[in-house]
Amino acid sequence: MIDKEKIIEGIKLFLEGIGEDITREGIKETPERVAKMWEEFEKERSFDFKLFEEYSNYSEMIIVKDIPFYSMCEHHLLPFFGKAHIAYIPNKKICGLSKLVRTVRAMALKPQVQERLTEEIADIVQKELEPMGVGVVIEAEHLCMSMRGVRSPGHCTVTSSLRGNFLSDIRTKEEFFKLIRQ
């Protein structure tokens, strides 16, 4: 659970630390806005991962691709954003497709690194569905690289996490990567 008062005080200190007048019209409500934003994020992080076991005969790959997301780099607290692709091969259970989208959003709404985000999504799908295999690919632009440091916008960082037959069967892996590129 988040501590709204700590967020408000922290943002006030941050703004003062960078030389802002926290009583200025455009900024005076910013600490409360930031705290409210994190409260909204916290609410979105929990959801029911609904399963449908009545479709137990379906055994081909299921993919939800181009799932948009926004996250926050834990190193610089700057956004990174992009799209995620999730696939799994059922083993007697399928989920509502929106649950895959919600999984991406829930895991992205916290300070994070893309590599861990990719792994966490794969871990949740694996845990909840116990499928034959899981594949997750994330493509993202990191503002910590675009706005600061190298200051080179437009780059795409790609991470992947594979489980089960996505890892052990080259044909499954190739099919997954081919389908997300279409």
Swiss-Prot record:
Instruction: Determine the domain of life of the protein's source.
Output: Bacteria
GO molecular function ontology, one term from the record = GTP binding
Please give the catalytic activity noted in the UniProt record.
GTP + H2O = 7,8-dihydroneopterin 3'-triphosphate + formate + H(+)
Pathway per the UniProt entry: Cofactor biosynthesis; 7,8-dihydroneopterin triphosphate biosynthesis; 7,8-dihydroneopterin triphosphate from GTP: step 1/1
Q: Which GO cellular component term is one of those annotated?
A: cytoplasm
- Oligomeric and partner information: Homomer.
Q: What is this protein called?
A: GTP cyclohydrolase 1
The species this protein was found in: Hydrogenobaculum sp. (strain Y04AAS1)
